[in-house]
Amino acid sequence: MTSSRLPVLLALVFSSLSPVLSHSNREMWFQDLFPPNTCPINAKTKTFYGIMFDAGSTGTRIHIYTFVQKSPEILPELEGEIFESVKPGLSAYADQPEKGAESVKRLLDMAIDAVPPHLWKKTPVVLKATAGLRLLSEEKAQALLSEVKEVFEESPFLVPEDSVSIMDGSYEGILAWITVNFLTGQLSGQNQHTVGTLDLGGASTQITFLPRFEETLKESPTDFLTSFEMFNSTYKLYTHSYLGFGLKAARLATLGALNTEVADRQMFRSSCLPKQLEAEWHFGGVKYRYGGNKEGETGFKPCYLEVLKVVKGKLHQPDEIRGSSFYAFSYYYDRAADTNLIDYEQGGVLEVRDFERKAKEVCDNMERFSSASPFLCMDLTYITALLKEGFGFRDNTLLQLTKKVNNIETSWTLGATFHLLQSLGITY
């Protein structure tokens, strides 16, 4: 569990959002994003909290945010964040929704300790599920969400009508982009040099950036673009979420097991795995048996050819990103840290080619890395192919890998929490 204290005037970003030009569904979403509130006269300093759950494919995470607003004329400050997570994700409980809800309750108990009792009834709690639940059938996903809703309703916190939901992947990208660029100071002042964001989850991956060239806007699919006003400027973002292209979904795709009815004792094999390996892996409530190619080749080259089939020609490649810089998090960060490309606590800056170099080292010497995840070669090779062949990044494209910016988690959850507080009229 971590806690941080940092005054951040994030509300300046979010309270000024308004739709200008957008894909139809997103236009409706942004219209409702932050309704105006009436500021009382002679109001005193107030402290308020927001509880946001991120129900991802590999784990469930709770973010407990503390805000302070000194007067109606001064925007709220982000005073601190408490963060914790549990594994596996809700989707692993697809056939046991009650157990999935129990994992949420364990995290919610932390909030009971963190939020003062006199503010419980004024503190909203919301869970937004991402790609893991999008991959489940509607019936199983709704069963999980219903159980979580019961846990919320039995708690002392404020439970909005839409307290549990499955969030569109593109909104993850939008909110994460706003959060990262605000926390890095890219949205203030006259000289704005925004950075793009790359998020690699277990089941999906997102890319979001601010196009600099009109050609990008003209050549991009219309549903990859969304616009809003902020700081008296209009931002037209390129953003898209690719379901099925997260790290763990890509493992299944490489093995030939994605969207496949798994037969009893069926074995999935890959040249990305150690030759003599035979093991079991549970993902999304399904058990998979996997192993290496005992008689075939192993190593980076045959592995890359396998992974290439998963990404080649499947993703849109805007030309201008080749010369842009991006913040990358989630599994980009984790795999880089696992292989000492970056410091686990501090993060670091890499070039795209650094992932390829490390993938070759791991894949061509699998025995040396046998104590690490058996999927390490496959994961690094997939990240390499995703960045180069999927998105079209150059070898020398710079990636800033980070878990936090100014001690705040790089996550869509902060933006979603402001949406929540504004929509409920909890801020002035």
UniProtKB/Swiss-Prot annotation:
Any one GO CC term of the record: endoplasmic reticulum
EC code(s) of this entry: 3.6.1.6
Pathway(s) the chain acts in: Protein modification; protein glycosylation
Compartments it resides in: Endoplasmic reticulum; Secreted
Molecular function terms from GO: ADP phosphatase activity; CDP phosphatase activity; GDP phosphatase activity; IDP phosphatase activity; UDP phosphatase activity
Glycosites: 232
Disulfide bond is among the record's keywords: yes
This protein's record includes keyword DNA-binding: no
Main location: endoplasmic reticulum
GO BP: any one term: UDP catabolic process
Record keywords: Calcium, Disulfide bond, Endoplasmic reticulum, Glycoprotein, Hydrolase, Magnesium, Secreted, Signal
Matches recorded under InterPro entries: GDA1_CD39_NTPase
Disulfides per UniProt: 272-303, 363-377
Signal peptide: 1-24
Cofactor(s), by name: Ca(2+); Mg(2+)
EC class: hydrolase
Gene3D superfamilies registered for this protein in UniProt: 3.30.420.40, Exopolyphosphatase. Domain 2
Reaction catalyzed: a ribonucleoside 5'-diphosphate + H2O = a ribonucleoside 5'-phosphate + phosphate + H(+); GDP + H2O = GMP + phosphate + H(+); UDP + H2O = UMP + phosphate + H(+); IDP + H2O = IMP + phosphate + H(+)
Active site, renumbered: 172
Pfam family for this entry, one: GDA1_CD39
Quaternary assembly: Monomer; active form. Homodimer; disulfide-linked. Homodimers are enzymatically inactive.
Protein name, per record: Ectonucleoside triphosphate diphosphohydrolase 5
